[in-house]
């Protein structure tokens, strides 16, 4: 087998090696079935057990009580931009959003397309989305407040969530779910495309509080209602079985190998601090996010434009992949998701030092 690289892609992203190895072992014969997990029926006991285990582990890891349901949908976070206002808006009430990057802007646009009254409670667009707003003013009659907990393009992250009182929080946690401890109680709904911290592309986690399900209008199309999936345990139609199986293995790894979310957060802080400490110690590379808003998941930085292509090319040749920034902003981005090892971050820092020595 070719040597595995250190994968800093923003998503689809690195998966834990023990998970990949377990998938490899089970690929041709899943639990004595004589079939691959790719072949078993979603109505079989084999897949039922996979689904049940994934739900139990997610609830245990995030400390979700019985008022929350865990659903597995398709369509990515982009479909949730549409489904959230469609399902959770209330007649005569505005829906509130905090705008912190391109993805939250897209969520706002989807709500407006539906004719919802959208209130932008705060925005960091005045400084190119390089920070998380400190003041969030939510109208007291808002149906919900939507935030993007981590912003992959600009490399910013909420380090404490806004206090909204009785107004439910809704969050896109696609890029930092399972990465740190947080209190789920203020959240009416959390959604996350799996392909960064939870599994492969193809499945979207939706964690919804049961009182929010009472808002879902009956006249919505069947496949666009959260209640369709809550009532059928995510199996109204054929679910993305292999992706859910992978999520189950990732959550098993988080529990049994890492030791839970608190331990995962400790590891993520060490990784982030290692790279940020180096960025702050020199002036060739320049971090783009304001220090108090820096993301532990996506570290964004720039270097002289003339050197960018050379940096990315040489890094790739050195086994450091996926460092090119998002096409909308350029620069570089190192995504340090849960499965990224500390030694990978240390190897990146060593490469950056050597690149400066040769080119600075």
UniProtKB/Swiss-Prot annotation:
Its EC number is 2.6.1.52. Pyridoxal 5'-phosphate binds at residues 77-78, 103, 152, 172, 195, 237-238. Its main location: cytoplasm. Its cofactor is pyridoxal 5'-phosphate. Keywords: Amino-acid biosynthesis, Aminotransferase, Cytoplasm, Pyridoxal phosphate, Pyridoxine biosynthesis, Serine biosynthesis, Transferase. GO terms for biological process: L-serine biosynthetic process; pyridoxine biosynthetic process. The modification N6-(pyridoxal phosphate)lysine is found at residue 196. Pathway: Amino-acid biosynthesis; L-serine biosynthesis; L-serine from 3-phospho-D-glycerate: step 2/3; Cofactor biosynthesis; pyridoxine 5'-phosphate biosynthesis; pyridoxine 5'-phosphate from D-erythrose 4-phosphate: step 3/5. GO terms for molecular function: O-phospho-L-serine:2-oxoglutarate aminotransferase activity; pyridoxal phosphate binding. Catalyzes the reversible conversion of 3-phosphohydroxypyruvate to phosphoserine and of 3-hydroxy-2-oxo-4-phosphonooxybutanoate to phosphohydroxythreonine. Belongs to the class-V pyridoxal-phosphate-dependent aminotransferase family. SerC subfamily. Homodimer. This is Phosphoserine aminotransferase. The gene is serC.
